[in-house]
Amino acid sequence: MAFAGILNDADITAALAACKAEGSFDHKAFFTKVGLAAKSPADIKKVFEIIDQDKSDFVEEDELKLFLQNFSAGARALSDAETKVFLKAGDSDGDGKIGVDEFGAMIKA
């Protein structure tokens, strides 16, 4: 599992179950349930690097859409509306993508 040693499998399962229905994803609730909100900056950076599929040092909209699938291959894709809300929450400089510092700030917000 990609998050072994960083996040607990049971927490991931519970967090994914809570946002199974389309339109139910709430990034703040997800970060808390999965245990990410309590993690160190180093662990948050490791998670960011996993989510940054193309290794561009940014998480773009297409990567956010598939965010949940980083936690479980069978998880659903986020809806366009959920993806846009998620991007807006994390993109503090308005460049259309989320950098590692923005990601960390969004998790701790």
From Swiss-Prot:
Enumerate the residues binding Ca(2+) 1. Answer: 52, 54, 56, 58, 60, 63
Q: Which GO terms describe its molecular function?
A: calcium ion binding
Q: Which residues form the EF-hand domain?
A: 39-74, 78-109
Temperature dependence (free text): Thermostable between pH 4.0-9.5. Average melting temperature (Tm) across all pH values is 60 degrees Celsius. Lower melting temperature in acidic pH 4.0-5.0.
What superkingdom heads the lineage?
Eukaryota
Could you give one GO CC term from the UniProt record? cytoplasm
What keywords appear on the UniProt entry? Acetylation, Allergen, Calcium, Metal-binding, Muscle protein, Repeat
Keyword Repeat applies: yes
Question: Where on this chain does Ca(2+) 2 bind?
Answer: 91, 93, 95, 97, 102
N-acetylalanine PTM positions:
2
Question: What job does the chain carry out?
Answer: In muscle, parvalbumin is thought to be involved in relaxation after contraction. It binds two calcium ions.
> Which protein family is named in the record?
Belongs to the parvalbumin family.
Q: How is this protein organized at the quaternary level?
A: Monomer.
Per its UniProt record, what PANTHER family does this chain match? Answer: PARVALBUMIN (PTHR11653:SF12), PARVALBUMIN ALPHA (PTHR11653)
What is the protein's name according to its record?
Parvalbumin beta 2
- Recorded name of the encoding gene: pvalb2
